[in-house]
């Protein structure tokens, strides 16, 4: 008899990789993935527990599955991931509809949990989140033509506003040979763009090899046949070195797009948030990167309303954005996370934090529009991702666009999904480029 399950993956790209690993393990064990949880034997909700909005989304999804279960339209409910890990002592007692819970160190136990639930047993598992990273194959759910490549787990930065080190554990690099083997397999299955991810990729190798190894890893990834783009997320200001900058500048397969989350520019705020480096360090690095890497696109993330941010500190941040002309910016209002030092600090109210975040995005919209207009009349490489019926055009991404968070390129042409092609840009509107294949 067929055993079916539905997967709901929430949160970041790193969590999606865990979902893809569970998809592989479940399919190997004879379970069949179905698109709709209604009527399925099991639903797996892989949760995020990072900020309040993410926790609310996770709880809403769990409760929705619980309602299906109560109505007899779903067999069992398994909850995994960061929310499960963060509230491991209480989640099953507070939400008794849940049949099984797995923490972030126990994704490999998904089949055992599923089998238990299928036989009417409740179970939970919380592994050691300081253990080496599990090397589990995955079913890639992204694309066409691209995939995430996670190179490490956990984080050692302990920023005052962030709970990730407490949830995901200390920083653990994956073995380089395992990463290369996975990348080769992805390339063999048509992946042309590798999006290299970890909480801090610039720290890669320091725990395993006693030195920073991201530049070496990028060199080896670029030697793999079929890989055309290597995109880097997330790099930290204090971990850049000359070898890495040289590799990014000189390796044609590394796209000239760097995601460097800075959160703020004011020295006082950086210090009390336990961010390494100063505002001047950020300015100097960005200047150096732009001088050494022509055409570089920088993405960063910012937090508005952090503890210590008054009008003067906020104005300093806005002035920095006007000067730095950062092409891609994500901004979030400060969300006090329980258990973190910042949650105990005095900060602006939620409404004011949101107002400041909105002002930053208004400012950034002008900068982004100027940047996008600069593509008009130019020919750029685009990774084709599909056909939009409503627009009557193909669409994809340029080197300046990371999936889900940046813009897209719509164009007329005849290439296939997952192919790289050249597109002449004719128009730019609200962060979207329009053109034609040549």
Kindly label every feature range from the protein language model.
Residues 336, 344-438:
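Terminal RNA-binding accessory module
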């Amino acid at each position: 008899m067929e055993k079916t399950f539905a997967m709901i993956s929430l949160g970041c790209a790193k969590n999606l990789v865990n979902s893809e690993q569970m998809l592989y393990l479940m399919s190997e064990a004879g379970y069949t993935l179905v698109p709709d949880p209604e009527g399925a034997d099991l639903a797996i909700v892989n949760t995020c527990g990072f900020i309040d909005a993410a926790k609310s989304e996770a709880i809403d999804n769990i409760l929705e599955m619980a309602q299906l279960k109560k109505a007899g339209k779903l067999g069992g409910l398994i909850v995994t991931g960061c929310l499960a890990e963060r509230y491991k002592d209480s989640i099953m007692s507070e939400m008794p509809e849940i049949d099984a819970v797995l923490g972030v160190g126990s994704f490999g136990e998904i089949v055992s949990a599923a089998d238990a639930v299928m036989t009417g047993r409740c179970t939970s598992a919380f592994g050691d989140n300081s253990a080496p990273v599990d090397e589990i194959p995955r079913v890639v759910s992204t694309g066409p033509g691209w995939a995430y490549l996670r190179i490490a787990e956990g984080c050692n930065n302990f920023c005052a506003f962030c709970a990730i080190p407490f949830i995901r554990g200390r920083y653990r690099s994956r073995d380089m040979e395992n990463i290369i083997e996975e990348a080769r397999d992805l390339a063999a299955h048509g992946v042309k763009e590798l999006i290299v991810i970890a909480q801090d990729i610039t720290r890669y190798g320091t725990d395993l090899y006693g030195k920073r190894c991201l530049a070496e890893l990028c060199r080896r990834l670029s030697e793999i046949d079929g890989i055309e783009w290597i995109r880097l997320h997330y790099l930290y200001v204090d971990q850049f070195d000359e070898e890495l900058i040289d590799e990014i500048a000189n390796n044609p397969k590394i796209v000239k797009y760097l995601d460097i989350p800075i959160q703020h520019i004011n020295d006082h705020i950086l210090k009390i948030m336990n961010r390494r480096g100063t505002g001047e360090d950020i300015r100097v690095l960005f200047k150096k990167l732009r001088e050494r890497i022509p055409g570089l696109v920088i993405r960063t993330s910012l937090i508005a309303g952090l503890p210590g941010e008054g009008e003067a500190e906020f104005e300093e941040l806005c002035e920095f954005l006007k000067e730095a002309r950062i092409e891609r910016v994500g901004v979030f209002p400060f969300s006090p996370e329980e258990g973190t030092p910042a949650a105990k600090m005095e900060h602006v109210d939620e409404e004011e934090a949101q107002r400041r975040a909105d002002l930053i995005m208004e400012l950034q919209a002008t900068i982004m529009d100027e940047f996008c207009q600069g593509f008009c009349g130019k020919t750029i490489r685009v990774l084709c991702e599909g056909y939009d019926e409503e627009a009557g055009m193909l669409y994809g991404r340029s080197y300046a666009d990371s999936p889900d968070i940046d813009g897209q390129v719509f164009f007329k042409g005849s290439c296939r999904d997952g192919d790289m092609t050249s597109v002449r840009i004719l128009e730019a509107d609200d962060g979207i480029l329009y053109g034609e294949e040549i």
